[in-house]
Amino acid sequence: MTMRLPPLPTIGELIRLFGLSAKQQLSQNFLLDLNITDKIVRSSGDLTNKTVIEVGPGPGGLTRSILKAGAKKLVVIEKDRRFLPALEVLRHAAGNIDGSPWEEAFLTKSEMDAKRYMSYAPNKSRMQIVMNDVLRVDEQEILQHIHAPIDSNDKTQWENMAPITIIGNLPFAISTELTIKWLKQIQGRHGAFRFGRAEFILMFQKEVADRLIANPGTKQYSRLTVMTQQLCSVKKLSDIPGSAFVPKPDVDASLVSMVPRVTPLGVNVPTPTLEYVCRQVFGQRRKMINNSVKTLGPEAEILLARAHIDPTLRPEQLTVPQWCDLARAYQQWENKPQWAPAL
C-alpha cells in the first residue's frame, strides 16, 4: 500500500508543537529513528491482513513504520492529548482501508467515552485513535467492530493465531501493571484475546525483559516470570541501547515477543491467585520454601506436601508448573487465614 507520510518532527519541533519544556515532554523516551522502528515492525511479520493495536504511539515514530509495513488496520491508544496533532496528520495520510481518501474518524474523549468511540468512528478508516489510558481500555470494545469473536470454549479456534498484533514502546512506569492486565485477559479470553491468540511485540526496560525470559535459579527469576511464562511463550528479539531513545534514558531496552500458549504450563489456576502466592512467597526468595510459604498463613507448610514440592528448595528454584501447583493448593486450602484476600 503506497502512501506519503510526513517526516518525523525534530526535537525542537516537538517542543514547539506541544508547548512543553524538553524535560516534561521527553520523559516518555521516544523512538524517532525510522531504521530502528522499521526493524521493530519487521519483527512482527506480515501485517498486511492484520489489525495492529499500538500502545503509546507518542508523536508517531513507530506508527509510521506500522503504516509503511502495510497494516490493514491500525488502532493507536494514547493517553496524552499533546500528541493529537502529530497522530491526526498520520491518520489523514493513511486514508481508508479500501485506499480511498481519509474521512473524519476521530472523536475526543470529551465528546464521548472510550466505549462509545468506536460506534461513532467509521470502520473503513485505516487508522483510528483512542484517547484513553491503556490500563483502562477494554480492547474488546474496540475490536468487536472489526473482528468476530471466537468461541472461547472451542480449543480448535484458540489454537489458531488471531489476525491481531499488539505493538508498543511501553512506558517503563506501567509496563509490569499493563503486562499483568493482559495476562488476566489471556486467561479469561477477553479483551483482545476474545478474538484469539494475539501476539505481542513490545519494548520493555531491559531489566524487565530479562525477568520475563528468566530461568529458575537465576536472580532475574521472579513473580512476573512465573505469571508470564505460565500463559505465554516469551522470547527476547533484541536489545536496544538507551542512546536510541530521545531523551536517552539511564537504562537500555529490549524488544520482546510474547505469544499466548494454546495450553498453559502446569495446572490452570486463576492469575490473581498465582500472582498473590508468588508475591507473598518470593518476598523471601533466599530462604527455604518451608519458611517462605509461612507468609501465606499459619501452618501453610501443608501446601508443600499437597503440591509435592521439596520443602528444602528455595522459591527461586521452583519451576513454573511447581508454582502453579502451589497456587492451586493454596486456592483449595480450607484453612486460609481470615485476612487472606478474596481471589
From Swiss-Prot:
Single annotated GO MF: rRNA (adenine-N6,N6-)-dimethyltransferase activity
EC numbers for this chain: 2.1.1.-
GO cellular component: mitochondrial matrix
Keywords: Methyltransferase, Mitochondrion, RNA-binding, rRNA processing, S-adenosyl-L-methionine, Transcription, Transcription regulation, Transferase, Transit peptide
Binding site for S-adenosyl-L-methionine: 28-31, 56, 78, 133, 169
Entry keyword annotation includes RNA-binding: yes
Subcellular location: Mitochondrion
Keyword Transcription: yes
BP terms from Gene Ontology: transcription initiation at mitochondrial promoter
One Pfam family from the record: RrnaAD
Function: Probable S-adenosyl-L-methionine-dependent methyltransferase which specifically dimethylates mitochondrial 12S rRNA at the conserved stem loop. Also required for basal transcription of mitochondrial DNA. Stimulates transcription independently of the methyltransferase activity.
Recorded family membership: Belongs to the class I-like SAM-binding methyltransferase superfamily. rRNA adenine N(6)-methyltransferase family. KsgA subfamily.
Protein name, UniProt field: Dimethyladenosine transferase 1, mitochondrial
